[in-house]
Amino acid sequence: MMNNNGFSTGEEDSRGPADQICCLLDDGERCRKQAGNASYSKRIQKTVTQRRLKLSIDSHARHIYICDFHKARIQCARTKRRRRDSEDDSNETDTDLPEVDLYQLQVNTLRRYKRFYKVSTRPSSNKAQLSETIMKHFKTIPIKEKEILTYFIYMVKSNSNKLDQKNNASAEAT
């Protein structure tokens, strides 16, 4: 078995990532998702450190393959950084991303979100601080845009939208 500073050289894993689980620890807990073909390189490790993602490689892992979920999460953090850098250069804001005003929510709702996602805040945070911290977390949640848009288009084309059905029923009644 060839081992290089805790990282696999890949020589001992000729079977590939097909039957392996992700090599990452997510907030101290080993990920149980199936590993894809993306590997946890030093460049990715640097991105994880810079973006303060709570990810690290499991020292007991015999490979460096990561799952698609963590790959997407790391890519999301990387593209957000690029986007912010380019906004700073051009003095423009990203207009195609809608801004959600979490301050409009009740404090109990914000606290419930905080508890559900285990977002750490100061114990005596006021509503403004709480909504700001939650907004930072909210923006880090990865979404599958293609999947969501495909589903939306399918629902519209197949008239499966409940709002469309209500509108058609009221139009037929008149």
UniProtKB/Swiss-Prot annotation:
GO terms for biological process: regulation of DNA-templated transcription. Component of the class 1 Sin3-histone deacetylase complex (HDAC). One of its GO terms (molecular function) is transcription coregulator activity. GO terms for cellular component: histone deacetylase complex. Gene3D superfamilies: 3.40.1800.30, 6.10.160.20. Belongs to the SAP30 family. Required for the function of the class 1 Sin3-histone deacetylase complex (HDAC). The keyword Acetylation does not apply. Its main location: nucleus. This is Histone deacetylase complex subunit SAP30 homolog. A zinc finger (Atypical) spans 22-70.
